[in-house]
Regions:
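PLP-dependent class I/II
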Residues: 1-163
């Protein structure tokens, strides 16, 4: 659901970054849109996460925010990667537990996350055990859709034989 579809936006906070939109993970470029009191409260965290990005990040951010055309390409790229891996994982009994609007797959592995992740690592596939994200993440793994399409296809072939 879009925040624009919510009539009473009193408790709505929108975080928008270039991480997903433009595949600029790690640049920490984005914005928060919320009621003034919420934005004011969030400012207390600003010194902890930095005060201003480097100039090259600012320039790249301006270019990315100014160009909407590339966003469709980025979405299509992630969709192809998702469509390559997800059917294999579902066929092997894993359950998708996350949103479709992400550049990762959050999957219920039906058991402990670290041994599952270690098993995949032995075959060259790196996933994040859900336990790395806190106790509530136990039993899940995170497949980031950041490798190339060819690497996702190789991973799908490995997953078919390993799981």
């Amino acid at each position: 659901m879009s925040a624009l579809q919510v009539e009473d936006r009193t408790n709505v906070v929108v975080f928008n970054t270039l991480s997903k939109r433009s595949s600029m993970t790690g640049y920490r470029s984005g914005f928060v849109c919320a009621q003034p009191a919420v934005v004011s409260a969030l400012r207390s965290f600003r010194p902890s996460v930095g005060t201003a990005p480097q100039e090259f990040v600012q320039r790249a951010s301006v270019a990315a925010w100014s160009d909407d055309a590339h966003v469709d390409d980025v979405r299509a790229l992630y969709r192809r990667k998702r469509d390559t891996l997800l059917p294999v994982l579902l066929d092997k009994g894993l359950r998708l537990a996350g949103s479709e609007a992400t550049f990762y797959l959050w999957l219920d592995v039906g058991g402990r996350s670290e041994p599952f992740a270690r098993r995949l690592l032995e075959h060259g596939i790196v996933v994040a055990p859900g336990s790395f994200f806190g106790p509530a993440g136990e039993g899940y793994v995170r497949f980031a859709l950041v490798p190339t399409q060819a690497e996702c296809e190789r991973a799908a072939a490995i997953l078919r034989s390993v799981l």
